[in-house]
Amino acid sequence: MIPISRLRPGRLHKKSDPTSNWLIIFLVWAAGLGAAAQFGKIAVSLDEFRTIYSVGEVGLGFLISCVGLVGLVFGVAGGILIPLIGIRRAFVWGMFGAAMLSALQAVHLQYFALIVLRILEGASHLLIVVAGPILMARHSSVAARGAVMTLWSSFFGLSYMLVALIAPALLTLGGTSALFVAHAGYMCVLGVALWRVLPPPVVTDSAQRTKKPLDLATILRLHVTIYTSPWLSAAALGFVFYTGLYIALLTYLPDFVDTVQRTGLSASLPLASIVTSLTLGVVMLRFIDPVRAVIIGYVLIAVSAVPLIFTLGQDAVFIVACLVLLGATGIVPGASFALLASLNADETDRAYATGAIAQLGNLGTTTGPPILAAIIAQFGLSGTVAFVMLFSACGISIHLFLAGRRSKTMNQRD
């Protein structure tokens, strides 16, 4: 079995605090925008694909979700394999793989062939989203790390917004081929830039202890080890409730306002989350630890959901209430990614924890929307508020439970 370091809290590791390399940080973050666009480029092109493929809405939806299924199934495996490959190498491979696959998708293929390429693209996506936050933490100072990880957490929502703004012109210019070629070029250019600026890896004890043959039994045992560890699992077990909430609310809240208002609300909701994340979220992490920040975030989400009940039917006020609610969600993702570094000082452990967050993050995005859809069908808006409060309570409870386990373990060592 692969051993995992037991002294994870950062205060137990006396290391010099390097200055932040902002060039690398912003390039890695820009690469994250491109990784999120692997979903967004299909989402904004569904009308085009309806004219190309006669597969129904479920089949079209699978063009989007099949990329996430790779992370759902192989998230932890990615966290195991990436340290073996090398963090830098895995990230650059992911970028070039994404560029190549996006270029191949620019050719009008049969539906099944496109699905195969999308699944392979999911593997490149996994390499990027697991290695990315590790590189961000590696090249940031301890003082700046909370802000840096919050910046990383914004990549998904911001990318969707940017793709929605840029894609229409590209689709008008040359259809999906133009959009996919542009995405391929973006990933290739960034891949070259990162290959040039990322320093070569330094072999550490952490890397040496993972240089062991892997088999299915070892991978399954490591799944158990990760999800029973209060350090390795904390970020992922708290994050899954956020992703379930966030995507579900983005999908269904606009349905509660007049049709004329829906497009504007759909575009504004992720922006509210991003603004809060990059302002209040960053400030909070300067003064309180990430676990408390996540808990505060979930409390604010639960409280912010209540006004929805009293403002339904008053679209202007209801829209403000929706923006406040989505703004409250912006605290949780940055604090959750900051947990990866604060609870796991060892880079191999960070890779394992990041693999878990990729796995459970995809679980949340996959299950949250259909759960909320079923609740709305039976209970309407009141069910939506109950859904938000339940998921928030689960996020708070799991973090309190895991914090208690970590405290008990540390007291036993003392």
Give the location of each predicted region.
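Juxtamembrane intracellular "pre-TM" segments in multi-pass secondary transporters
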Residues: 8-18, 199-234
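Extracytoplasmic gate region of multi-pass secondary transporters
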Residues: 42-43, 231-275
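Conserved MFS/SLC helix-loop-helix module at the cytosolic interface between two early adjacent transmembrane helices
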Residues: 73-109
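Helix-to-loop junctions at the C-terminal end of transmembrane segments
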Residues: 74-86, 277-290
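Cytoplasmic helix-loop-helix junction between adjacent transmembrane helices
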Residues: 117-156
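Helix-loop-helix hairpin linking two adjacent transmembrane segments in secondary transporters
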Residues: 142, 150-199
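C-terminal transmembrane helical hairpin of 12-TM major facilitator-type secondary transporters
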Residues: 291-336
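A late C-terminal transmembrane helix in Major Facilitator Superfamily
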Residues: 342-381
